[in-house]
Amino acid sequence: MEPFVSRIYFGDLLAGTDEAGRGPLAGEVVAAAVILDPAQPITGLADSKKLSEKKREALFVEIQEKALAYGIARATIEEIDELNILHASMLAMSRAVALLSIEPEYVLVDGNRIPPNLPCSAEAVVKGDARHAAISAASILAKVTRDRDIVQVAQIYPEYGFEKHKGYPTALHLEAIRLHGITPIHRRSFGPVKKILEG
């Protein structure tokens, strides 16, 4: 895939932001923002979904060690149900950018929409997690954090198998919902959950 190069911003204080967890039926949506250090390049950055769990975990540590700044934020299950998943994802990305210890001069956002309330100009990059290192780094921080969150939840609700499906609507997960009902971490606005609630 063609690497992305902004034709608007050419400086170094560029943040990438991405989210993880738009598709699952359960759990919060997690976003991250990263400003990479050009003096400390990180090899192996790619779309987090294309990397093995082991590789993601290693890069998760390296990104935090080498980045000039990073922020990780969430939108709650209540916010997802109230706003919808798209707006909740935008909110989480805005929060992640706001948590950066260095204010960016420009933000690259994975996808085709720009979150509101960013502190600077921004550009949306379709498939950005595979095309720009800063967005790739953000996608890795977001995915590893969300996966860790959901594995912790699995200890509270062991009968749902969250550690296996991470909250996605797999046959295993849907069967667990059918057998055991809805938990407080399920997104009530999502089709399969809504259907069960409506009986």
From Swiss-Prot:
Catalytic activity: Endonucleolytic cleavage to 5'-phosphomonoester
Residues annotated as transmembrane: none
Residues at which a divalent metal cation binds: D18, E19, D110
Record GO terms (molecular function): manganese ion binding; RNA binding; RNA-DNA hybrid ribonuclease activity
PANTHER family tied to this protein: RIBONUCLEASE H2 SUBUNIT A, RIBONUCLEASE HII
Function noted in UniProt: Endonuclease that specifically degrades the RNA of RNA-DNA hybrids.
Name of the protein described by the UniProt record: Ribonuclease HII
